[in-house]
């Protein structure tokens, strides 16, 4: 009842061939975008809550958003980046803030 199939040499892959086929996942930047209405304290809260930054780093990133128009909050695989964007945007809307989180290919 077992599968008695044997592998021919043409069907097997060498370790080098397997490494060539494996590609690291595409990575994406999660970006917070500036607006004229979201309080700075709310941006800091988002950075701590969803990206686990301490108060000092969250404040630095908030100031980058404020003065440069946007800041990269982290670099993640597609699935994680998409989840972070949805979570942050949902949280902003629930708190009646126009803060916008987006993703872009790293």
Curated annotation (Swiss-Prot):
Source organism of this protein record: Pectobacterium atrosepticum (strain SCRI 1043 / ATCC BAA-672)
Region (Disordered): 1-21
Name this polypeptide is given: ATP-dependent Clp protease adapter protein ClpS
Homology family: Belongs to the ClpS family.
Subunit structure, as described in the record: Binds to the N-terminal domain of the chaperone ClpA.
Biased composition (Polar residues): 1-16
Functional description taken from the UniProt entry: Involved in the modulation of the specificity of the ClpAP-mediated ATP-dependent protein degradation.
GO BP terms: protein catabolic process; proteolysis
